[in-house]
Amino acid sequence: MENKINELKAKNLDLEKLINYQDGSVVSREILKLPTGTLTVFAFDAGQGLSEHTAPFDATVYILDGEAEAQISGQVNLVKKGELIIMPAGQPHSLKAQKRFKMLLIMIRS
């Protein structure tokens, strides 16, 4: 895994093209992993999602393609391509794909 991550360093990356949709699935690819945080791209097929959970750190989601339904502490937010949403630490949140979408997840541990 470390070699694959190193291959991406010091290069221009088209994040949307780093990952492909897969029918009926959620696909992820970690592009940076450090003790201080991670960058991961995801592709969600329609009808897929991440169930409600909490995280010990803020989770920032940037939509690369499509649109996501992000629920945070019971409030539903529609997040579209080019937009981001910060899911606060300790608050229950989930993601759902009404249509396909791709996202970048930025986790900073602090």
Regions found by a protein language model. Name each.
Residues 35, 64-65, 80-81, 99:
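A cytosolic small-molecule/anion-sensing beta-strand core signal
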Residues 25, 39-55:
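Conserved short histidine dyad/triad with adjacent acidic residue
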Residues 57-69:
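Glycine- and acidic-residue-biased ligand/ion/polar-headgroup-sensing regions
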Residues 38, 67-69, 76, 92, ...:
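Structural motif
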Residues 1-36, 71:
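A short, N-terminal "cap"/entry segment at the start of jelly-roll beta-barrel domains
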Residues 74-89:
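Short acidic-glycine-tyrosine-enriched beta hairpin
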Residues 89-110:
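Ligand-binding loop in jelly-roll beta-barrel domains
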